[in-house]
Amino acid sequence: MLKLRYPLTFVLLLGACASAVAGPIAAGKQRVLGSEYSPSQSKDFTNDWDGDVPENAGKWGSVEAVRGQMNWGPLDEAYQLAKRNHMQFQFHCGLWGAQQPTWVRNLPPNEQRAAIEHWFAAIAQRYPDIDLMQVANETLPGHNQPDNRRADSGNYLRALGGTGATGVDWVLEAFRLARKYFPHTKLMINDYNVTEYNDQARQYLHTIQLLQQEHLIDAIGIQGHLSSNGPSVSVQRANLDLLASTGLPIYITEFDLDGRTDAQQLAAWQRFFPMFWEHPAVRGVNLWGFRHGLWRENEGAYLINYDGSERPALTWLRSYVASRP
């Protein structure tokens, strides 16, 4: 009879430790699986994710609410976490028509442009190793362009050239500035509803192709805030294919799904997540939170309960990703 060299309790302890340090869900996979990083999402973050995108800490209005006074602390935390743990760091976001400093709204256009360049230069100097830079967020008509609708919209669209002959001159100029200040960083655009709605996919494609003509864009961002009863997989896959026709890699930047019941959430994840994860153009998926306190709290998008237990969708996600290349 073979004698056990180590007590059973020691063997079990070793197994538990190995499980605890097994690494992120997508470790060793062909795609990155990450999450937004914020105080409510920070607990055990590195256990599951190998991508890190700050939720609000990188928005201009969060950093420079008072002109010339830079609050880098929360953004430093997200960036340093990524670098310490060899995670992909995606900067969210350079320019957006929301959560912008209110002081920029009433500046003359030439001063607004100078302020934008100062903002870009400050980011580039402090964070030299950004992997992916979301230059402009939600640029499509009717989304969140930096116009004068609200006090925090920025009102600097004209300072970047307005809509102009292309309809998106300001977006092109934003990317020209980004290429100047981030010459070694992969630049991306980001928007929502671009897989769900054909017209928005085509508008997005138009902007992207104009950026490509000047070699200003390196990746496409698709937010991925989906509804369990949203447009069909076939519709969304066709729009993914349309955007993939550019030859650019695609990143799902803010993925979440409603799930007021475990069964509803699980079914939605099983229906929609593989559509993205298995698409050949998609290089990564970032969730827009996974714990309570995330943006779609009321819709039940969280994957971990208050007591720390996993909802079935997260258990399924681990198994599904493990089964894929």
Positions of predicted regions on the chain:
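Boundary/entry segment of secreted carbohydrate-active catalytic domains
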Residues: G23-A57
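Short, acidic/polar
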Residues: E36-D48, R113-I123, N198-L211, A268-M275
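Acidic-and-aromatic substrate-binding clefts and catalytic sites of carbohydrate-active enzymes
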Residues: L33-D44, W60-G73, Q100-P101, L140-G142, ...
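Aromatic-lined carbohydrate-recognition surfaces of secreted/lumenal glycan-active proteins
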Residues: I25-A27, R31-Y37, L132-V135, G167-A201, ...
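Aromatic- and acid-rich polysaccharide-binding/catalytic face
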Residues: D50-A57, D131, N137, T185-D191, ...
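Bacterial N-terminal signal peptides that target proteins for export
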Residues: M1-L8
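Substrate-binding cleft and catalytic face of glycoside hydrolase catalytic domains
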Residues: N47-A65, G73-V194, L242, G259-T261
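Substrate-binding cleft of secreted/luminal carbohydrate-active enzymes
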Residues: R260-G308
